[in-house]
């Protein structure tokens, strides 16, 4: 899907796609093509250094100095989605993915619990997919052991794309929300509030 979003900008260029779970093959292909003297761009969503392919490229290249690798910073969903809702991440926050394909669910549970106990605002990536439709509900069950049902949250879908939508709701409502892999979920901290329709987490400036 990421190549489909950009292919019209680069007419005449060779495009290569690999399916999900083939990330190693995708990165290795990029390195092999670069070693042939080609200029290669490995396309990721958001920022390639945040749940992207940047680290994997460095791992596969190993201690070799060739080919040269340049990581171009992008705009991750925590930032772009937060801007759609307002400013929910203005203070300390955690970013947690609910995908257990590469991370054990027990580790994800622990990270959710620690973030809630630390009163962090939380940006949640990969809240659901066809293979794990109940992961957000399970995550909410964990958060609700620490946080109140009325804790403010937000959902943004298709950030920056056609059909973008957003919603502000409570943690209790989030538990039953309809989400998919195109959604990013935000859970506020104890100071998060709604001001004129915007979800914000104050930094703590005095006299405001």
Residue ranges and their predicted role:
Residues 31, 69, 84-85, 109-113, ...:
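A generic local secondary-structure boundary/capping motif
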Residues 17, 42-44, 69-74, 89-91, ...:
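General beta-strand structural signal in soluble alpha/beta enzymes
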Residues 1-69, 80, 175:
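Class I S-adenosyl-L-methionine
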Residues 1-3, 17-25, 75, 95-102, ...:
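Short, acidic/turn-prone active-site loops that include or flank metal/cofactor-
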Residues 28, 53-54, 81-83, 106-108, ...:
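Short, well-ordered secondary-structure micro-motifs
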Residues 39-40, 117-208:
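A contiguous loop/helix-start segment that scaffolds small-molecule binding in enzyme catalytic cores
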Residues 22, 48-49, 100-103, 128-131:
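Glycine-/small-residue-rich active-site loops that bind phosphorylated ligands and cofactors
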Residues 50-118:
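Class I SAM-dependent methyltransferase SAM-binding "motif I" and its flanking Rossmann-like core
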